[in-house]
Amino acid sequence: FFMATDNESGLTDYFANAGGGGLRYETAKFKGFQFGVSGFYIFNLGSSDLTKKDSATNQLSRYELGLFDIQNPENKNDINRLEEFYLKYHFRKSYLQFGKFLLNSPLINLQDGRMRPSVVEGIWTELFPGKLLKIEGGFLYNFSPRSTTKWYSGVKSIGLYPSGVQPGGMQSNYYNNLNSNGT
């Protein structure tokens, strides 16, 4: 995946070229049970210096860095993550899943991370009690957002990305400033 940002004069231009691949294994259903595991790796095949902040904004490249690991801009070679590791139980047309897995729901989706999606850890179910009714929900306690390699609790996963500013011009600064009774 290649991308480049050509900014206006006075701002830094960036480019990045990423390559990667993944392995995934999912068993056939056995008495309703199914196991899955997957991992993904990314390599920086060539880029501008993604550790260099723009002199005018004092910010790193937002988009090009997102191809790799936003938490570790220096890492160009060891960008890998165990993405899925789950046990799933199928019953009727429904299922119950536990572990690390990809989730597409009205609230959380795979998102376009270009090189890797967001992944969740917890327990999740989709129930189909009737032809026109679908119920889904669960308890998610860890997240590995797109463009990262590590796992974070719910409150620690919010604010990892560069954020906007408040109406008065101050940084929003969600990261490490949220509390929750959950995760």
Outline where the language-model segments fall.
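Transmembrane beta-barrel strands of outer-membrane/channel proteins
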Residues: 1, 37-41, 98-100, 137-141
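Membrane-embedded beta-strand positions in outer-membrane beta-barrel channels/transporters
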Residues: 20-22, 83-86, 122-124, 183
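Surface-exposed extracellular loop regions of Gram-negative outer-membrane beta-barrel proteins
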Residues: 88-103
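Signature for the C-terminal beta-barrel architecture of outer-membrane proteins
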Residues: 16, 114-183
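Structural signature of outer-membrane beta-barrel channels/translocons
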Residues: 26-28, 88-92, 126-130, 183
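Repeated loop/turn-to-beta-strand initiation elements of outer-membrane beta-barrel proteins
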Residues: 32-35, 93-97, 132-135
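Extracellular loop and loop/strand-boundary signature of outer-membrane beta-barrel proteins
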Residues: 7-11, 70-73, 108-111, 176-178
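Surface-exposed strand-loop-strand hairpins of Gram-negative outer-membrane beta-barrel proteins
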Residues: 2-18, 54
